[in-house]
């Protein structure tokens, strides 16, 4: 019973990391676009 829970834990951890990465990427992209628009 240890293996399935461990697998689920890793899947949850991986999906959480992916979501965090995407969120950071979007925030960085928005800030970069904002800088470009201000410079123009």
Swiss-Prot record:
Pfam families, sorted: PsbX
Keywords: Membrane, Photosynthesis, Photosystem II, Thylakoid, Transmembrane, Transmembrane helix
Species in which this protein is naturally found: Thermostichus vulcanus (Synechococcus vulcanus)
Primary localisation category: membrane
Ranges in the topological domain labelled Cytoplasmic: 29-40
The protein, known as: Photosystem II reaction center protein X
Transmembrane regions: 12-28
Lumenal side: 1-11
Family: Belongs to the PsbX family. Type 1 subfamily.
GO cellular component assignments: photosystem II; plasma membrane-derived thylakoid membrane
HAMAP family, A to Z: PSII_PsbX_1
Cofactor binding mode and count: PSII binds multiple chlorophylls, carotenoids and specific lipids.
UniProt subcellular location: Cellular thylakoid membrane
Membrane topology type: Single-pass membrane protein
Subunit and interaction comment: PSII is composed of 1 copy each of membrane proteins PsbA, PsbB, PsbC, PsbD, PsbE, PsbF, PsbH, PsbI, PsbJ, PsbK, PsbL, PsbM, PsbT, PsbX, PsbY, PsbZ, Psb30/Ycf12, peripheral proteins PsbO, CyanoQ (PsbQ), PsbU, PsbV and a large number of cofactors. It forms dimeric complexes.
């Amino acid at each position: 019973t240890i293996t399935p829970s461990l697998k689920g834990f890793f899947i949850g951890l991986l999906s959480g990391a992916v979501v965090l990465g995407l969120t950071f990427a979007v925030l960085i992209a928005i800030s970069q676009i904002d800088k470009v628009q201000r410079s123009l």
